[in-house]
Curated annotation (Swiss-Prot):
Location of the active site: D843 (proton acceptor)
Signal sequence coordinates: 1-25
GO molecular function terms listed in the Swiss-Prot or TrEMBL record: ATP binding; epidermal growth factor receptor activity; epidermal growth factor receptor binding; GABA receptor binding; neuregulin binding; neuregulin receptor activity; protein homodimerization activity; protein tyrosine kinase activity
Knockout-associated phenotype: Embryonically lethal. Embryos die at about 10 dpc, due to defects in the development of myocardial trabeculae in the heart ventricle that lead to severely reduced embryonic blood flow. Mice also display aberrant innervation from and to the hindbrain, especially concerning the trigeminal, facial and acoustic ganglia. This is due to aberrant migration of a subpopulation of cranial neural crest cells.
Protein's name according to its UniProt entry: Receptor tyrosine-protein kinase erbB-4
Activity regulation as described: Binding of a cognate ligand leads to dimerization and activation by autophosphorylation on tyrosine residues. In vitro kinase activity is increased by Mg(2+).
Span of the annotated motif Nuclear localization signal: 676-684
Boundaries of every Protein kinase domain copy: 718-985
Gene that this polypeptide is encoded by: Erbb4
Annotated EC: 2.7.10.1
Short motif PDZ-binding, span: 1290-1292
Enzyme class: transferase
Pfam families: Furin-like, GF_recep_IV, PK_Tyr_Ser-Thr, Recep_L_domain, TM_ErbB1
Amino acid sequence: MKLATGLWVWGSLLMAAGTVQPSASQSVCAGTENKLSSLSDLEQQYRALRKYYENCEVVMGNLEITSIEHNRDLSFLRSIREVTGYVLVALNQFRYLPLENLRIIRGTKLYEDRYALAIFLNYRKDGNFGLQELGLKNLTEILNGGVYVDQNKFLCYADTIHWQDIVRNPWPSNMTLVSTNGSSGCGRCHKSCTGRCWGPTENHCQTLTRTVCAEQCDGRCYGPYVSDCCHRECAGGCSGPKDTDCFACMNFNDSGACVTQCPQTFVYNPTTFQLEHNFNAKYTYGAFCVKKCPHNFVVDSSSCVRACPSSKMEVEENGIKMCKPCTDICPKACDGIGTGSLMSAQTVDSSNIDKFINCTKINGNLIFLVTGIHGDPYNAIDAIDPEKLNVFRTVREITGFLNIQSWPPNMTDFSVFSNLVTIGGRVLYSGLSLLILKQQGITSLQFQSLKEISAGNIYITDNSNLCYYHTINWTTLFSTINQRIVIRDNRRAENCTAEGMVCNHLCSNDGCWGPGPDQCLSCRRFSRGKICIESCNLYDGEFREFENGSICVECDSQCEKMEDGLLTCHGPGPDNCTKCSHFKDGPNCVEKCPDGLQGANSFIFKYADQDRECHPCHPNCTQGCNGPTSHDCIYYPWTGHSTLPQHARTPLIAAGVIGGLFILVIMALTFAVYVRRKSIKKKRALRRFLETELVEPLTPSGTAPNQAQLRILKETELKRVKVLGSGAFGTVYKGIWVPEGETVKIPVAIKILNETTGPKANVEFMDEALIMASMDHPHLVRLLGVCLSPTIQLVTQLMPHGCLLDYVHEHKDNIGSQLLLNWCVQIAKGMMYLEERRLVHRDLAARNVLVKSPNHVKITDFGLARLLEGDEKEYNADGGKMPIKWMALECIHYRKFTHQSDVWSYGVTIWELMTFGGKPYDGIPTREIPDLLEKGERLPQPPICTIDVYMVMVKCWMIDADSRPKFKELAAEFSRMARDPQRYLVIQGDDRMKLPSPNDSKFFQNLLDEEDLEDMMDAEEYLVPQAFNIPPPIYTSRTRIDSNRSEIGHSPPPAYTPMSGNQFVYQDGGFATQQGMPMPYRATTSTIPEAPVAQGATAEMFDDSCCNGTLRKPVAPHVQEDSSTQRYSADPTVFAPERNPRGELDEEGYMTPMHDKPKQEYLNPVEENPFVSRRKNGDLQALDNPEYHSASSGPPKAEDEYVNEPLYLNTFANALGSAEYMKNSVLSVPEKAKKAFDNPDYWNHSLPPRSTLQHPDYLQEYSTKYFYKQNGRIRPIVAENPEYLSEFSLKPGTMLPPPPYRHRNTVV
């Protein structure tokens, strides 16, 4: 009670200024309905707002305040007292909303059909400007709708307001006030406000007008006592109990008094029992009663409206524009031929006839010529459809002339003009207003409604079959004595009479327009509407009439139809009925007795007696009655008032209480039975589940089990060396793995989860481990193991050359076409494997492809990858960061990811390679990418790409996902291109392009700077035997080459494998040029017989073996090596390029002569082991076979110019005669060639065991299914990557500066 008293003390200070003023002083302005739309110029937006609402008190419509800057003066809004629609305050930057005098929001129209007051997003994201206070200190009433206050960063005190006191219907669905406003950093209300205020001072306390009222008040109040109730017509509070003390009116304001309705235009006169015109009538205009509607409004009944409804027409009576019901068709004026929109038209034709639909008045002329009726081929106008001429049935007036010189042959009259009343003749055709010429098929005119031809003459000639024209007295149609008639050369009158073409006998002597009683100019006896009849239905018939002269008029609808032989009525109106069909009120028949009709001083209520006559109710009955006494008054419980005596109400109350208790008991029993049945049903379902649980799975999927194994590593086996980078979940270190109980050192990458991350990050971290451990492919990074220390660690193989994006950018001057296309094939094969395993990558890009060696790349970063279930076709992602510029359009719009969306990303990745690390859509804001793609624009064609390569990219960027190629097709397409790379990629100096040395990479050098890798072993070489059930290869011991040796002890023995003509491979996997330079190798399980010693370069040594005819299969004993060496296995990515094939193996393993055959599938390139001992003190690493020490050094030949270049696949112009293996023999290295082998990576090429080489299909199966590689690179934090954008930042309203778009390309 103290709270209420304190508030009312403050509220009393405002009462004097808050009462309703007469409507004459109210300044009314129109509202808007633009919602969040605004003008492009903010200055113009502010000026428009000020122009609308300056000096405005009542807003007839919606008050919308949007997109106003912080420095604008909004003091003009203080004059607004009332809003009939909704109030919208959004997207503004000002601090204070000065609607200090706003009392009531009526909510006749709601924002989003729900809110009468909506205030949101009123702050500037990149600044400190925003709405801080709501100056609504006098707002006390919202009649309809709820309140929405949200996302106002700096707004204070809104959460202290008692909104239930303001909103008339405070349902939970109408109230929204969330914590995104600035409530946490705001001050407290003044102590006199008791916790509810609009601002910090005592002048901003909220005034309560409903929740503090006494129970007896049925509305607002101005104090806590019973005597302080406001009048029931008050809204928003009051200063006293009268209807003139209201702050605002619930319904209408009549000169300062709040009333239920405005004084009506007609009032019931109890003396005459008639509705009479009320001279004190007023019209409803919004919530006000006005004597006269505004000049731009019209009167409809007793209201001011903007336009008449479709069933009424606007007329002016006594200087007042009013809406009157249309007697027939509401008028519509149209332009005639030669006027207005038809100024250039010469006739009515098929191109313009539709413009005359529903026309009642033709402003101009109607002309019918042969080019309109039968068509105009010259102007490509078709003949008119005769049915369309019926549009003229609505025409009542033609202000000009009617010219008919052509008519459809199947129409014998002009009945389409049956409603034509007047031909004005304001424009004449050679002095004529009606012209009908040479219409041979016309038999009658049938202008049955024509009453006047205001000006001009009549010309009707040469109509050989026209009759009835001679019966008409044409002069009765004329308005002046100067008008003439020319009617000749039509059908003779006697011929018409002979054929019975005469007027109906009911027509008078004035004539007729055609046959039948409806064509008479006037009737001989009686008429009903337009039809002449013999007599009226006075005593019989379906409906009864009375005679009004010669016109039969139907009796009033309130007259009861009498028996045959008795009159139903004596005249017009309900007071001339013989008997009433419903009730009789005085002399008038009415549909019901008056019930609440407004009288001169009060409302009229009557009841009907047993004779159905109406009598007045007792004066105490204010809601109607059933009889003459006060005990017969009608009582409505919801009004809160009763005129029944107390003794009459007691039984009703008792019956209501008993009935309510009975209903409550029934509801309680029903609820108990429902709960019991539900419990029993649940127990039965659980019993059935337990019975069948161990019998068979409930939902067998049929999916094969994932038998991938996860290696758990101890923390003591790992040593962290150097930080490589930081990611969203943790940090990546370069490290060393020393397996427990062994002496080998394996370089690895260690990804450690941050200690501050939560459980969700741990789950996502392990999900990534699951996916990486399940993948097994030479071009996918796979997990080596997991260390379950307090901070989870993922251990992967260390990639020595970093990501492909940085690699191509660093070596763009040394990368040729062959290598680019090889990478395209490898990435496609990796993605094809993912598609076979039903895994969607979702983040394929050049930054997520790592380089193990220049010839071998691997796909990594499975942080966004998702496995699909057996029956899933797509994955729908939740919110989060996304690489927008690499994503397909369906991913951006619907977050729907499929294998075909990965194809889109693959196309962007290829574009990055072909531009040597170019940024896609560089300079374009990420938020503009979706619109750009929808308009058809794509990445431009890279300069080095031919149209063949670019079209493959374009196919990857098709909007329809099903139209994009599959990864299998992409792998095959780029394999075909890789066989002839210079045909598809045009790179200047491609023939002389030198592949960068594996050790030249900056990333690789940084890895080697801090750790001695002398004893390092690659992770794959350590782990592969555990993944293959194939015999381990046998190796010879490795020694150093004596650089002073110049002779060869033995020539290399021959061995065979399918090879290209431009290189050969030793049996250990090494490569050599035509000059015979040895390459890194690994031994196979077979030995080869010795060959004769060759002189000079090693190429000469091979000449003998090449030309000795058929070579034989080598046989030699095995040599055992240590266990660490036996872990090494064949690299799955070894392949033999197919340019210039020399031959193929026969059944015994020998090479057959070369012959034409189809090109083999493009296989994976040879891969080096990046971690071997480096050269020290200028010494060259020795080949393992000591017999190479006898090689002699001869003078270099002219073709030795390539000897110092890296030897990779498909990079040589010359071809070697044949390919041979070398075993147990030594090649000498010429002095000039020593430096070609400074890079230790060149000494470590490997091939699979011989059994694998003899079966290429077997090799391909293993390389696809079992080999896997690991990587230690982690993707950077998503928020730091500018190519990622969150879902929220793509919403409308996100403001980003639009940099110039330098390269655009459009796909048609």
